[in-house]
Amino acid sequence: MLICVVGMPGAGKGEFVKVAREEGIPVVVMGDAVRREAERRGMDVGEMAKRLREERGMDAVARLVEEDVERELRRAGVVVIDGIRNPEELEYFRDRFGERSVIVVAIHASPQTRFERLRIRGREDDPDTKREFEERDERELGFGIGDVISRADVMIVNERVSLPEFREKCRMVIRAILRGDPDDLPGGFDHLRVPD
């Protein structure tokens, strides 16, 4: 089973990934493959992602991590994929591993909340200004991440909750998915919004 976590920058994907690892689930980060390729070519990561998709198609990054995903699936039977950016990548995984084997979990937070989180987080590629933040969102949306979010089987809203509360929401969703028990979540896996 593949659990694909998607969301705009600062929504909380990283925390979901941490919880998944705590639950013993291996994680494949698509951005790591892009970073490796960028380093190999001596390019900026954002430019590398764009170039890969131009050179090899919109599902290029999914194809780059396919071996890692297969290895982790053989080892653990489940893997979290962090970093799907467009519908073509999602469809690649669904075609390769089976429609019913892929669960999409979207993490949602408002733009204002995400901007504040990114400013506090302070990673090298995080925006310093509202304008930089908006440009980054536009770039992400341009890749097609909004289309992937709209196809989510599960949506976790990460607004007005403490970090421990959000992490518990993530844990609840992960455990329900692993049990294959949508009844553990209100509304099942069909575009679920985990209650605030």
From Swiss-Prot:
ATP binds at G7, M8, P9, G10, A11, G12, K13, G14. Coiled coil: none annotated. GO terms for molecular function: ATP binding. SUPFAM superfamilies: P-loop containing nucleoside triphosphate hydrolases. Pfam families: AAA_17. Keywords: ATP-binding, Nucleotide-binding. PANTHER family: DEPHOSPHO-COA KINASE, UPF0200 PROTEIN MJ1399. Belongs to the UPF0200 family. This is UPF0200 protein MK0400.
